[in-house]
Regions:
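Soluble extramembrane regions of membrane proteins in the secretory/endomembrane system
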Residues: 1-212
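Core alpha-helical transmembrane segments of integral membrane proteins
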Residues: 204-233
Length: 233
């Protein structure tokens, strides 16, 4: 399970669905689930940085900010070879203007900036809060890329090593087709969460129902899409 920015504890699947919908406007990408896409980005940001899956639909935006044409751009499209953020000045200028006075182009630029910031945060190990802090009654969980100096002893070692370990096992599993070791690492995370979280975790039944709801919602919107296409034919 994971803690979303609002503080809710929820299945990773629910959280990654929200992230991918924000970035790509869909729960799936070319047959991959949201969880596969987001975990894939964590595993191999260099690969996913070259995949055009960041949606933007303003036709003026590419020409205005020297970006590729089309509805989707790559993460690396907004960075120069030296790592500079190419739309930084334009974003700052848009934010300096009162919201009511921003043009449609500026509003869409800020939407793109939000999507890029989500992916950048994930690349830095943030926005993926998996670790409760022992004895912390505030209920805050921490991401692998956060300042983990608040942990001590064995807890410090665990939270700093477990995610790289899992991503390594998942990478191996993609090549071998054997997910047993990756599953064991996930089980270790779950045990840690159950033991250390001051906030009650979802029960297995609650998780199952939420996953069912996620898939049912996806099926509903897919069916509506097919129905709309049928009406047009």
């Amino acid at each position: 399970q994971i803690q979303c920015p609002t503080g809710r504890i929820e299945p990773v699947d629910t959280y990654t669905d929200k992230l991918l919908r924000k970035i790509y406007r869909s729960d799936t990408f070319e047959g991959l689930s949201s969880e596969q896409v987001i975990i894939g980005f964590l595993m191999n940001p260099s690969y996913w940085g070259n995949i055009p899956f960041i949606r933007q639909t303003n036709k003026e935006l590419p020409q205005a900010y020297s970006l590729p044409e089309g509805k989707y751009i790559r993460f690396f499209d907004v960075f120069s070879e030296d790592g500079s953020y190419l739309i930084s000045d334009a974003v700052d200028k848009a934010y300096s203007r009162p919201a009511a006075e921003r043009s449609r182009l500026e509003k869409d630029l800020l939407k793109l900036d939000e999507k890029i910031n989500i992916l950048y945060s994930l690349q830095q190990g943030k926005m993926f809060a998996l670790f409760p802090l022992p004895g912390d009654t505030s209920g805050k969980w921490y991401s692998p890329g956060d300042d983990l100096s608040v942990y001590s002893g064995k807890d410090s070692l665990f939270v700093s090593k477990i995610m790289p370990w899992y991503l390594g096992e998942a990478s191996d599993a993609l090549r071998t087709g054997t997910w047993e070791s990756a599953g064991e690492v996930l089980s270790m995370m779950n045990v840690y969460q159950q033991k250390q979280s001051a906030t009650p975790l979802l029960t297995e039944k609650q998780v199952s129902w939420e996953l069912f709801y996620n898939k049912a919602r996806l099926f509903f919107w897919s069916a509506m899409g097919y129905m709309a296409v049928g009406l047009l034919l």
